[in-house]
């Protein structure tokens, strides 16, 4: 995919850089693989705001994406590549030999007409899924399970990938984009290749309205608020906040480590923070 820039006939087009999606399918999604999606506006079941700066945006329908690749050893053909408003990656509509349709995450270098398959002993080619124990060391992968049968959780956003760098006592060693090295069971499935739409990292919205179309409201800084609204608020003139960055509720933020899942610490061989030293 290439990037598109525009002749600035309006101010909003001067900085605008978007992904060229001309090669994607232009029709509607498959009705049996979609369902309605209601906009929550960052509210919970009590109507209270639990996620700030969300709301509005274009209406969406949710596409059921198969992260488990549940149909094993049945070849499928890629019917088309589609845009999905619920994720940064593109999705591929595949048709199995028995006629069943399914959506999967589209990897890079997957084209219409290609054949994909999920199974224990399949070729190493983009879109094919197999257990980590059956892959050669060095393979670039995405949509990696953390527990066998749970469905892919690691490396699912646009351009993301992990690399199989070794094996150890029934576990596979993965290097993630963040620099973290992690142990995952060799029985976990993963898909070969990197996720599509790597140019997503280079887009520029060009205007505030394009963020609003996505359901993002203005992100107000604490130093621009009053003391009643934020610990950084108030002061005469412009201030730096006067203290280390905190959330509106006084909790340290911006770099403060929040990981507290000690049960899974044993699966992290090298943290993402170590490469920064």
Curated annotation (Swiss-Prot):
GO BP of this protein: cytoplasmic translation
Keyword Phosphoprotein: no
Chain segments carrying region Disordered: 222-277
Keywords attached to this entry: Ribonucleoprotein, Ribosomal protein, RNA-binding, rRNA-binding
Molecular-function GO terms, alphabetical: rRNA binding; structural constituent of ribosome; transferase activity
Entries under SMART domains matching the protein: Ribosomal_L2, Ribosomal_L2_C
UniProt xrefs under SUPFAM superfamilies: Nucleic acid-binding proteins (SSF50249), Translation proteins SH3-like domain (SSF50104)
One Gene Ontology cellular component: large ribosomal subunit
Cysteine-cysteine disulfides: none
InterPro entries, A to Z: NA-bd_OB-fold, Rib_uL2_dom2, Ribosomal_uL2, Ribosomal_uL2_bac/org-type, Ribosomal_uL2_C, Ribosomal_uL2_CS, Ribosomal_uL2_dom3, Ribosomal_uL2_RNA-bd_dom
Family according to the record: Belongs to the universal ribosomal protein uL2 family.
Purpose: One of the primary rRNA binding proteins. Required for association of the 30S and 50S subunits to form the 70S ribosome, for tRNA binding and peptide bond formation. It has been suggested to have peptidyltransferase activity; this is somewhat controversial. Makes several contacts with the 16S rRNA in the 70S ribosome.
Subunit-structure text: Part of the 50S ribosomal subunit. Forms a bridge to the 30S subunit in the 70S ribosome.
NCBIfam families with a match to the protein in the record: rplB_bact
The name this protein goes by in its record: Large ribosomal subunit protein uL2
Protein encoded by which gene: rplB
């Amino acid at each position: 995919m290439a990037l598109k820039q525009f002749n600035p006939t309006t101010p909003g087009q001067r900085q605008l850089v978007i992904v060229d999606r001309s090669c994607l399918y232009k029709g509607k999604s498959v009705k049996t693989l979609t369902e309605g999606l209601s906009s929550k506006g960052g509210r919970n079941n009590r109507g209270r705001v639990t996620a700030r700066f969300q709301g509005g945006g274009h209406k969406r329908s949710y596409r059921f994406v198969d992260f488990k690749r549940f149909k094993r050893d049945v070849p499928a053909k890629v019917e088309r590549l589609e845009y999905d408003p619920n994720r940064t990656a593109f999705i591929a509509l595949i048709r199995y030999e028995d006629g069943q349709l399914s959506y999967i995450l589209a990897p890079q270098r997957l084209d219409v007409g290609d054949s994909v398959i999920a199974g224990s002993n399949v070729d190493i080619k983009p879109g094919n899924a197999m257990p980590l124990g059956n892959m050669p060391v060095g393979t670039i992968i995405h949509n990696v399970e953390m527990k066998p049968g749970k469905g892919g959780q690691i490396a699912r956003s646009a351009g993301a990938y992990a690399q199989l760098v070794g094996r150890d006592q029934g576990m596979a060693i993965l290097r993630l984009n963040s620099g973290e090295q992690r142990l995952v069971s060799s029985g976990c499935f993963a898909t070969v290749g990197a996720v599509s739409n790597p140019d997503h990292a280079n887009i520029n919205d060009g205007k505030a309205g394009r963020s609003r179309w996505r359901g993002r409201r203005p992100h107000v800084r604490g130093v621009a608020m009053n003391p009643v609204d934020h610990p950084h608020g108030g002061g005469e003139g412009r201030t730096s906040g006067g203290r280390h960055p905190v959330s509106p509720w006084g909790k340290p933020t911006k770099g403060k480590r929040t990981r507290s899942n000690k049960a899974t610490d044993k699966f992290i061989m090298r943290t993402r923070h170590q490469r920064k030293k």
